[in-house]
Regions:
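A long, amphipathic alpha-helix that forms part
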Residues: 1-29, 175
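Active-site neighborhoods of enzymes that stabilize oxyanions during catalysis
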Residues: 61-162, 166-174
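Acidic/histidine-rich catalytic neighborhood
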Residues: 28-29, 35-73
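Acidic active-site catalytic centers that drive phospho-/nucleotidyl reactions
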Residues: 10, 36, 170
Length: 182
């Protein structure tokens, strides 16, 4: 699952850097490898089928995933909310209750209920068949597994330094400085 993709990418990057390091200009090149988010492998025991708790036909639309966004039919929001508060491995908020740090929920297109699974949990409405169990992102962005990777090397970077986690937005000024853009 997730670890397999990481190992695959590691091998690709190793081949790439091996070839680049053979070039005469290699000592002059700065490299940055980053991602927009982390990934977590699903834990089958943490799977939540919302169909076990709620009738699917009580919703106008459901966006499965992480987070899961529910658009209840009129008059069903409070009922669904009270039921979902008791479901293990998830946190549910009414749209207006989503904590500000998530920067999510204020847009008119967001559904009335937002379900954030615990890391490794998958939430879906399924009638039959096996759930998709690979990996996902979109969990609590304060969880270490959701942090983006950042690797940098080259003449502009100190060697053998481990930097604390940083938000991706801080990469913009760094890249501008490297490219001498003001």
């Amino acid at each position: 699952a997730v670890i397999d993709r990481v190992e695959e990418l590691d091998a690709v990057l190793a081949r790439f850097f091996s070839k680049v390091n053979k070039l005469d200009i290699a000592p002059k090149i700065d490299f940055i490898v980053t991602s927009d988010h982390g990934m977590a492998t699903f834990v089958p025991d943490k799977y939540v089928n919302l169909g076990d708790y709620l009738p699917r036909d009580s919703f106008k639309f459901v966006f499965d995933g992480v987070p899961t966004v529910l658009y209840p039919k009129p008059g069903y929001t409070d009922t669904a909310y009270e039921i979902l508060k008791k479901v293990p491995n998830i946190t549910v908020w009414k749209k207006e209750e989503v904590p500000a740090r998530y920067q999510y929920g204020s847009n008119a297109r967001i559904g009335d209920l937002i379900v954030l699974p615990d890391v490794g949990c998958m939430v879906q409405f399924r009638d039959k068949g096996k759930p998709w169990l690979g990996g996902a992102h979109g969990y609590d962005n304060f969880d270490p597994t959701m942090q983006a990777i950042f690797y940098a090397s080259g003449p502009s970077f100190k060697k053998n330094v481990t930097h604390p986690s940083l938000p991706n937005i801080s990469l913009y000024p760094l890249i501008c400085r490297l490219l001498k853009i003001k």
